């Protein structure tokens, strides 16, 4: 087994997390699975084959993975979190593009002020900064948390042992209130036939059973909002995993990640937008070259994808070949782990902020048109302002999605989200052009191509694509 280049760093992380795990189990005083301490010992020694073997045995019995048929009560321990954090960091460091993955993590660290609360909601965005902290358990230099485990009571208990009383961690009561709030809203939508894909609700007597990724993420989101509201003296940042509706009114592009402002923003001003553009130009240039401009066409982007990603013809290419090659290995390396997928996902997330602003402007304009004629006439200046603002956001979302697609054209998220924007603007031909080249890298995108063709044949083409 090949040794990671930063092996001393990984060993040190195992050592720190073993000490934390021992402290956690001393509080729990319960029977533990036999693999825990040999796992940490193997990590400290650099015995990576044993680390992988023991982690696999524990993970197969952990509560974390749905549909686990060999569930082990002994795995219900807070020590599972240090185990998971060490293994996930080790995996990040053993990829062929691990130097770029670590560079991504280091950039996230640079962007976040000390004392902030940071939601790391992708594997790289969570586990690499966790390991790069001076002391993760002490929130030094900032508090690394994931929204995606907020509904897990064991994870919240783990956070409390580390971070209270310095920051407020949601309680079991907060979790229950979030669950009840979600159920109340979801039942109403179920009766109206408005459940979203990934929401599965079933009535079982007097109770409602919930399953599905969308439902779980919605509950996690409500709990994380409590955390935001109860920690008013801390800055918040997020590396987006799934779009989170409550964040958008507060969201501002902040380099690779998103800043969650304390107050809702009336707009994203020209200074914020220019700063975002300048930052991403500097990020993208060493990775895939300095060629994407505002006037760059979809044909030019698809030609680049065909040449560099599909044919791997690097003639005249001025970027990181390892970056682009890993984007084509989506079968072997999960897309959320590769460096190209991480940069692309972050750019898509920021494009999503602009899309939310587009829709918000549209809603404000619709609200004005619902007024009486007399009141509407008084709002003509607002209509012109909102229309101009909306066009500005459309331009930025379009450009950001083009960059996201060029960074990883095999990414379903980048392709689907951009296709949604293009079709909403009547640019189905461009969406279809993108889907046709993307499916060469990821055959799963054939479905999108079929949907786009079907929509194009309709008299009034309408398509809804969900990331």
Named regions from a protein language model:
Residues 41, 353, 421, 452-460:
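TPR/TPR-like alpha-solenoid repeats
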Residues 367, 371-374, 432-467:
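Terminal, low-structured helical/coil segments at or just beyond the last alpha-helical repeat
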Residues 1-121, 125-407, 413-414, 423, ...:
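ER/secretory pathway lumenal C-terminal domains and tails of membrane proteins involved
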Residues 349, 417, 451-452:
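Canonical tetratricopeptide repeat
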Residues 416-417, 428:
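Extended alpha-helical scaffolding segments
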């Amino acid at each position: 087994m090949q040794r990671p280049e930063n092996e001393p760093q990984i060993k040190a992380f195992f050592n720190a997390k073993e000490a934390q795990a021992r402290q956690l189990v001393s509080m729990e005083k319960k029977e533990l699975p036999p693999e825990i301490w040999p796992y940490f010992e193997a990590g400290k020694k650099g015995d990576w084959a044993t680390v992988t073997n023991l982690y696999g045995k524990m993970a197969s019995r952990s509560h974390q993975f749905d549909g686990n048929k060999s569930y082990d009560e002994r795995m219900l321990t807070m020590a599972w979190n240090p185990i998971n954090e060490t293994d996930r960091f080790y995996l990040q460091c053993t990829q062929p593009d691990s130097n770029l993955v670590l560079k991504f993590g280091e950039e996230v660290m640079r962007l976040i002020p000390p004392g902030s609360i940071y939601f790391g909601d992708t594997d790289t965005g969570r586990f690499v900064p966790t390991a790069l902290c001076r002391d993760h358990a002490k929130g030094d230099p900032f508090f690394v948390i994931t929204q995606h485990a907020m509904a897990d009571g064991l994870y919240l208990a783990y956070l409390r042992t580390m971070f209270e009383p310095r920051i407020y961690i949601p309680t079991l009561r907060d979790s229950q209130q979030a669950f009840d709030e979600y159920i109340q809203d979801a039942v109403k939508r179920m009766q109206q036939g408005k459940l979203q894909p990934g929401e599965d609700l079933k009535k079982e007597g007097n109770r409602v059973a919930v399953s599905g990724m969308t439902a779980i993420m919605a509950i996690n989101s409500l709990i994380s909002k409590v955390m935001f509201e109860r920690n008013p003296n801390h800055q918040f940042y997020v590396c987006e995993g799934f779009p989170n509706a409550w964040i958008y009114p507060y969201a501002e592009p902040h380099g690779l990640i998103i800043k969650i402002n304390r107050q809702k923003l009336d707009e994203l001003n020209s200074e914020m937008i220019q700063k975002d553009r300048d930052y991403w130009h500097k990020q993208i240039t060493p990775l895939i070259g300095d060629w994407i401009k505002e006037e760059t066409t979809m044909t030019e982007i698809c030609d680049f994808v065909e040449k560099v990603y599909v044919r791997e013809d690097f003639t005249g290419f001025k970027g990181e070949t390892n970056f682009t090659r890993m984007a084509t290995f989506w079968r072997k390396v999960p897309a959320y782990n590769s460096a190209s997928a991480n940069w692309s996902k972050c750019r898509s997330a920021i494009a999503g902020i602009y899309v939310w602003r587009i829709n918000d402007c549209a809603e404000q304009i619709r609200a004005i048109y619902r007024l009486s004629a007399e009141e509407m006439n008084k709002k003509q200046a607002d209509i012109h302002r909102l229309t101009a603002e909306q066009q500005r956001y459309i331009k930025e979302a379009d450009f950001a999605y083009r960059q996201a697609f060029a960074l990883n054209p095999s990414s379903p998220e980048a392709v689907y989200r951009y296709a949604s924007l293009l079709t909403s603007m009547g640019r189905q031909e461009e969406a279809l052009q993108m889907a046709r080249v993307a499916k060469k890298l990821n055959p799963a995108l054939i479905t999108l191509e079929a949907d786009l063709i079907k929509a194009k044949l309709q008299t009034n083409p309408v398509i809804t694509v969900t990331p």
